[in-house]
């Protein structure tokens, strides 16, 4: 099983950061930890690399598991984060932006991500 880490990132307006991946799915930024890197550090780095947004971890959420298109099982550890700034696209991504919770609910492709959004909104400090 491959380990991953990602961020559910909100700005001060309570908008959430989403990416549109190579296959056209709207998702949260995530990726693989580098050797010697904690999952929290990996999540912060992946948000930066994939979106250009500097984010800080507020608290851990929970892991999700899925099988990727290559048949590899992945476990992604998620963190609630605060960030600001205009997103920019990493090569291979087809969209990025800040969205209201209502917009995000309509865009997110996977049920696990919808669940993460709801838990993150409940735990997000005012």
Swiss-Prot record:
Optimum temperature is 70 degrees Celsius. Ndx1 is stable up to 95 degrees Celsius at pH 7.5. Also able to use Mn(2+) and Zn(2+), but the activity is less than that obtained with Mg(2+) ions. It comes from the Bacteria. Its EC number is 3.6.1.61. One of its GO terms (biological process) is AMP biosynthetic process. Substrate binds at residues 21-23, 30-32, 66-68, 74, 112. A motif (Nudix box) lies at residues 31-52. It catalyses: P(1),P(6)-bis(5'-adenosyl) hexaphosphate + H2O = 2 ATP + 2 H(+); P(1),P(5)-bis(5'-adenosyl) pentaphosphate + H2O = ADP + ATP + 2 H(+); P(1),P(4)-bis(5'-adenosyl) tetraphosphate + H2O = AMP + ATP + 2 H(+). GO terms for molecular function: ATP binding; bis(5'-nucleosyl)-tetraphosphatase (asymmetrical) activity; hydrolase activity, acting on acid anhydrides, in phosphorus-containing anhydrides; metal ion binding. It is an enzyme of class 3 (hydrolase). This is Diadenosine hexaphosphate hydrolase. It comes from Thermus thermophilus. The gene is ndx1.
């Amino acid at each position: 099983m491959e380990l991953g880490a990602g961020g559910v990132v909100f700005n001060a307006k309570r908008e959430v950061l989403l990416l549109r991946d190579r296959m056209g799915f709207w998702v949260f930024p995530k990726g693989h930890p580098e050797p010697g890197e904690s999952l929290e550090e990996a999540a912060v780095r992946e948000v930066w690399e994939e979106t250009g947004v500097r984010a800080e971890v507020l608290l851990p959420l929970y892991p999700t598991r899925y099988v990727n298109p290559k048949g590899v099982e992945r476990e992604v550890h998620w963190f609630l984060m605060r960030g600001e700034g205009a997103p920019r696209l990493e090569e291979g991504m087809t969209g990025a932006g800040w969205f209201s919770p209502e917009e995000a609910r309509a865009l997110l492709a996977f049920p696990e991500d919808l669940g993460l959004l709801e838990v993150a909104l409940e735990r997000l400090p005012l």
